[in-house]
Amino acid sequence: MPVAARYIFLTGLFLLSVANVALGTTEACLPAGEKKNGMTINFYQYSLKDSSTYSNPSYMAYGYADAEKLGSVSGQTKLSIDYSIPCNGASDTCACSDDDATEYSASQVVPVKRGVKLCSDNTTLSSKTEKRENDDCDQGAAYWSSDLFGFYTTPTNVTVEMTGYFLPPKTGTYTFGFATVDDSAILSVGGNVAFECCKQEQPPITSTDFTINGIKPWNADAPTDIKGSTYMYAGYYYPIKIVYSNAVSWGTLPVSVVLPDGTEVNDDFEGYVFSFDDNATQAHCSVPNPAEHARTCVSSATSSWSSSEVCTECTETESTSYVTPYVTSSSWSSSEVCTECTETESTSTSTPYVTSSSSSSSEVCTECTETESTSYVTPYVSSSTAAANYTSSFSSSSEVCTECTETESTSTSTPYVTSSSWSSSEVCTECTETESTSYVTPYVSSSTAAANYTSSFSSSSEVCTECTETESTSTSTPYVTSSSSSSSEVCTECTETESTSYVTPYVSSSTAAANYTSSFSSSSEVCTECTETESTSTSTPYVTSSSWSSSEVCTECTETESTSYVTPYVSSSTAAANYTSSFSSSSEVCTECTETESTSTSTPYATSSTGTATSFTASTSNTMTSLVQTDTTVSFSLSSTVSEHTNAPTSSVESNASTFISSNKGSVKSYVTSSIHSITPMYPSNQTVTSSSVVSTPITSESSESSASVTILPSTITSEFKPSTMKTKVVSISSSPTNLITSYDTTSKDSTVGSSTSSVSLISSISLPSSYSASSEQIFHSSIVSSNGQALTSFSSTKVSSSESSESHRTSPTTSSESGIKSSGVEIESTSTSSFSFHETSTASTSVQISSQFVTPSSPISTVAPRSTGLNSQTESTNSSKETMSSENSASVMPSSSATSPKTGKVTSDETSSGFSRDRTTVYRMTSETPSTNEQTTLITVSSCESNSCSNTVSSAVVSTATTTINGITTEYTTWCPLSATELTTVSKLESEEKTTLITVTSCESGVCSETASPAIVSTATATVNDVVTVYSTWSPQATNKLAVSSDIENSASKASFVSEAAETKSISRNNNFVPTSGTTSIETHTTTTSNASENSDNVSASEAVSSKSVTNPVLISVSQQPRGTPASSMIGSSTASLEMSSYLGIANHLLTNSGISIFIASLLLAIV
């Protein structure tokens, strides 16, 4: 075969092989990075006159990258190559001259051989055009030029790689073409042949499946008019790569593409080719088969809150199911069955066409997680003797997206984006959308007590920053749809109703009626001859949208959406249940976005019960949330009523009403939670009632700006009722943790009444740095009727008013309290006023008025004046801790034996912390100790037993405590002195340094014992031998029974260093045992010592003395021995009294007082005893 014929045959065979049409699926991409215009051009070294390497498909596919990379440029949209060397017959070029002054350095063309660089960076090009004669122009030489995309290289011998993404504007077949190739070129389209998605800058892949194969055979003519076709889907990015090699001289590569509508694009690919930075971590960047996400139905966009659809042989169904009676479950689903199209709720994260209907949302996002859950839990309690607490919760549509994009506005590059119902469409970064709903619906059946019911509904809250919501559609978008929670369309006299009902089962045989009141909310839309149509072009076979309800075209139609709630009731119960339902709403808060979706239902429930149960426990909780907007006035109120009945005719009614009015700049959120727990045990047969109630009202305020704050200190109220036929002790303790200030007043009231009594102490503080006014009123009313017919009523009211001006810098709140006690025989009124001050950036004044009234028909009332202690310090935020330890002491007298019965005191600790938030929050822990005297007057019960007959006697007593500290060893002595047989006269100063107390002397003779109460003087002596400290105490009875009791409290305050943790103060409990020869006398008392922790540590020492004119010889001595190194907390005081040993002890005490040398003899005497 001649050579020419052979070449013709090979050329024809090659043309047949390269004229291919891509019939397979082309892989597309969806890069999420920043889109850049144009393609990236990389330059690689190629050997001059190498006419074989570029003929290898492997080299053209990936082998070129093994050579030296010369450089790269980006942003190129003109892809064709047409280079000519500077010789006759070629294109005009500019020669280089050292004398030229015109600068054309941007497009140098240097007609010199490789290696001969006549034009340096400092030289310029000539302004005139010159051509070299063929004799002077070597066509086989390498010439330097910037003709190729402005990159200075040798176009005569170079390999060029062009990479980028091709974005088809329409779906269809795209035909790429090379009109001619000199020397060799290929074109690849698709993520599986050009380069991997999101990896444009990575080394080339090894695929040789070229869309256009323009490789020039060795020693053959350059191929011409080479074409390659591929099917593309609009809106996807397709990787495209062009590799061109030139071995010598001229270089030519014209690039073109024909669009599906017949439009031909040559050379300039502006708007079609783009580049993205590599992102290997992006999930679902590649779309292997875009055809799976294609849709033959085309829809036009609809406006918000309405939709219209026109389908060709399309059926849309919507179903709603309800399951009753006890467990309610509802599902919202919407499906469309169309000819030539299918729409489902399942989505693939790797597809741009994502659709969803009903209560879920759909969007195109990357790394998106969407969850939706609906649960109804309805417990059922029957045949119960106690109230049932029921809680049900509902959560719906929780969506969390990270760097996701959801939009209803589509550009020409988006093939399909849809969104439907219950969710909004916006463009946001790191946006979190959450929608939750909760239902609380109690149900109690066959119960003997009323049920406490609370219902609440919380709706979505979405906060977006710089969100954009749009529903506009570009005409180039093939499919964009949106739907919402309702629709009104065009049809003929049709009625569309969508309802949701929740029905709670019932129980018959009810002995009490249930009162039910509920508010019903519904939204209805009535159109009178209204027509809403959606224009559709003839090329639109299908327009669809889905939402909560179906979409139709109607005239004179009525659309109603209603939701009814049938609340539970109490049946077979001895009490009626009152139910009240209310409706409130809330809305989203967005920055630069408009979107409102709010539904909130709040269902408070109040109940009262009447029963004959011996014991009853009731619990009521109220939750209130208020929002104060800028320059607005908001008022709220809280009321609760609790009624209790037991088998004894005792009733208690407590009402609490408060009103808060604020006018302030800024937003203030206040959350108030109030809880009341009441326990009423059954009355014993001796008509002794013990009742306790605790009311805690923690109130926390949170301000959105640092200059506005509301602080109300919590208050704890403790009351103890002990009505009996004998004396009764009533103790009321009020404690209030501090927030802004640490100075506070503590008031304690002790009252003795014939039937019952109550004392309430409430401390509150309101501080607002900016101008405001606030008022609060609290009313407490209680009535107790015991079985003996006596009635006690208590009425107290508290008024708090506060005002503030930001002009001053000092705050002086004033607290005043008034109390009045009236009875049939005694009327006592007392008034106390205390004030404190602290420094703050604004000025506020607070007035608190507390008035209380007690009325009882019998028994005189004795009142002990309250003791108040004030501490003053200032800090911005404080955590306060309190620790209280109580101890019980008992003394017993046993005949002819010695016994010790220690009792351990109960330890109670209470720690409360509170904080105030400003620009910054600094938390300090302060420790404080309130000075308190050890002198206590209480009631004790004296049990006397004789001849197997015991009698109890209630008598008031004086508690005296003596403390001795020697070398770090502390000895504490406590004495309870009954006052029933004596008359006390209180004096203001200490008359004697000796300690005087009352003692009981038991004398036994011939089996008959007698007791005599006599005052005594306590003398204490201390001796130390071999590091052993011995303390001797002597009681000297006096002859007179008329005592003058004096007390003196010496407070010694020492400044202690600041400690981060709160200091702890404990009271030590000791047991004293008296062992006489015969007879039994036991003294029981209960003493509680409370100490507060603060920065200042106060050491309190108290001494008690009784003065008398006559002094007798000492008869009772107590001895305590402790090693010097023993800590005070481990010391246990012992006291022994006996008439038989009085002479020994008297001698020992005499020896100790006369001479220190007699200590050894005294020790021997004590050892004998």
From Swiss-Prot:
Taxonomy, superkingdom: Eukaryota
Biological role stated in the UniProt entry: Cell wall protein that participates directly in adhesive cell-cell interactions during yeast flocculation, a reversible, asexual and Ca(2+)-dependent process in which cells adhere to form aggregates (flocs) consisting of thousands of cells. The lectin-like protein sticks out of the cell wall of flocculent cells and selectively binds mannose residues in the cell walls of adjacent cells. Activity is inhibited by mannose, glucose, maltose and sucrose. Also involved in cell-substrate adhesion, haploid invasive growth and diploid pseudohyphae formation.
Single GO MF descriptor: D-mannose binding
Annotated Polar residues bias: 856-884, 906-916
Protein's UniProt name: Flocculation protein FLO10
Region ranges (4 X 36 AA approximate repeats, Ser/Thr-rich): 384-608
Entry GO terms, CC: cell periphery; extracellular region; fungal-type cell wall; side of membrane
Region annotated 6 X 27 AA approximate repeats, Ser/Thr-rich, chain positions: 303-572
